[in-house]
C-alpha cells in the first residue's frame, strides 16, 4: 500500500497494515527533542532518555496527514537509538525538510535511520 504524494503521485510506499492512507499528504513536525523510556524500573518508573539532534537547536519529524490527523513515520533504529528502542522516528535537519514536502530527494534516503553521531542522548530520570 502506498501513500499519495503531495503532488498527487504515488511517491511514498509504506507497509502500513490495515489502515488506509490513500490521499494522505506529507507533513513536517518541528521538534527540539524526543524521549524514549527503558527498563528496568526505578522507584516504579522507567528510565527517561532525551534525544536531540547533534549541532542543531531543532529538527523535523517526517509525517503524513489525512482528515485532520497526522502520524509520525518510524523506521528501524539508527546506532544512537538502537540501545534504547527497536525503532525510531524519521528525522531531518532544519534545512532538509523541504525535500520531504517537494519529493526532491530519494525516498529511501529520506526514510533511513539517523547515522551514528547524529543524535545526542541524555538521561533525564533518574538524575
Name each model-derived stretch:
Residues 1-127:
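A structured binding-face within diverse protein domains that lines the active/interaction site
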